[in-house]
A protein has these predicted regions:
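Sequence context of c-type cytochrome heme-c attachment sites
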Residues: 2-122, 139-150
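Hydrophobic, small-residue-rich alpha-helical packing segments that form membrane-like cores
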Residues: 127-131
Length: 150
């Protein structure tokens, strides 16, 4: 009975995800996000670290558990989900999959067009938005940061 309820819930959440795609697609050309490839044009060493981290594969974890449409999951596994110009779907915005630079440092398209020193928010503030007790019970910034330090 619980399995059946869970499957119905999942089906409904997936249907809702696809119902909102048209509206989101209309705003994608005005994106403030550039994606990891744009960032890597200047930050190649940082990009290499990210590519080999769990952040660089975050979206695949959703695919494996059939949750690549669930807004409660996407908000922490992609760039800018439910924000103007952010991730829409794997088909529409593949360049915004995974926990990329802009999740932690903020939208970077304008920075890439006119680089200025001091860009980006502090990682510690970004970490605690997604690394919460119920999803990341063992999260400890001092232990986790060395895994992605750049």
């Amino acid at each position: 009975e619980m399995v059946e309820l869970y499957e119905k819930y999942n089906d409904r959440v997936e249907a809702m995800f696809f119902e909102t795609l048209a509206d989101k697609r209309n705003g994608r050309n005005k994106s403030v996000y550039g994606g990891d490839v744009l960032c890597s044009s200047c930050h190649s060493a940082e990009h290499e670290i990210w590519s080999n981290s769990r952040h660089g594969r975050a979206y695949n974890t959703l695919r494996k558990i059939n949750k690549a449409f669930d807004p409660e999951c996407l908000v922490c596994h992609v760039v800018g989900f439910n924000l103007p110009g952010g991730f829409i779907s794997e088909l529409d915005t593949p360049n915004l999959k995974n926990v990329q630079c802009e999740v932690c440092h903020g939208p970077g398209r304008n920075h890439a067009l006119a680089p200025q020193p001091g860009f980006g928010s502090k990682a510690t503030e970004a970490c605690i938005k997604c690394h919460v007790k119920n999803h990341s019970p063992r999260f400890n910034y001092t232990e986790y940061w060395p895994m992605i330090k750049h």
